[in-house]
């Protein structure tokens, strides 16, 4: 059986630390943040979509498929992940947040190797010091378990991942690759 993969850029948050603006559309080095993410994703995986809960028309101008969370009220990244898993035509979905334009060019390859070699359903990035759970590769078969988890009111990504025996994949050689842009000052760097 051939295992298939797709990717989703997570741009569905409220961006409270950035004053509530749509973070994925903020210009960084003369381009919206989500476009930087797509440019790094595209060489790694061909099938890419965007999870956005506002400004869908603007995101759709990129030519990429755009979808919003099925759960209303900005319930966090797991809500977008659940919606993506339920809609995916692939066996696994790679997730990348819209605010980390320097993520590793081997992100998909390393996460894919981890899930295949260890027969896992979920793998996420770890930089040697911190977990980066929004950089993850998730089996679509986990959608029912995630729906149950969210129905309890829980929203913590790492708790869900630990319950699913997720694999932390070592990216300690490139810890700065996971630096995210959290405020308007960061956009100027």
Swiss-Prot record:
The keyword Magnesium applies. One of its GO terms (molecular function) is molybdenum cofactor guanylyltransferase activity. It is an enzyme of class 2 (transferase). Monomer. PANTHER family: MOLYBDENUM COFACTOR GUANYLYLTRANSFERASE (PTHR19136:SF81). Transfers a GMP moiety from GTP to Mo-molybdopterin (Mo-MPT) cofactor (Moco or molybdenum cofactor) to form Mo-molybdopterin guanine dinucleotide (Mo-MGD) cofactor. This is Molybdenum cofactor guanylyltransferase. It comes from Pasteurella multocida (strain Pm70). The lineage of its organism: Bacteria, Pseudomonadati, Pseudomonadota, Gammaproteobacteria, Pasteurellales. The gene is mobA.
């Amino acid at each position: 059986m051939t295992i298939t993969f797709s990717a989703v850029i997570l741009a569905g948050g409220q961006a409270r630390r950035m004053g509530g603006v749509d973070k994925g559309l903020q210009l960084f080095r003369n381009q919206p943040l989500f476009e930087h993410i797509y440019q790094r994703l595209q060489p790694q995986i061909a099938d890419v979509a965007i999870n956005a809960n506002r400004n869908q028309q603007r995101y759709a101008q990129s030519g990429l498929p755009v979808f919003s969370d099925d759960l209303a009220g900005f319930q966090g990244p797991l809500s977008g992940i659940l919606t993506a898993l339920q809609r995916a035509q692939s066996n696994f979905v790679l997730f990348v947040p819209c605010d980390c334009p320097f993520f590793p060019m081997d992100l998909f390859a390393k996460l894919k190797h981890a899930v295949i070699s260890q027969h896992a359903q979920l793998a996420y990035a770890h930089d040697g010091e911190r977990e980066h759970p929004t950089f993850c590769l998730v089996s679509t078969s986990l959608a029912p378990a995630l729906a149950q988890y969210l129905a309890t009111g829980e929203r913590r990504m790492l708790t869900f991942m630990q319950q699913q025996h997720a694999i932390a994949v070592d990216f300690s050689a490139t810890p700065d690759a996971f630096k995210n842009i959290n405020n308007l000052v960061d956009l100027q760097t």
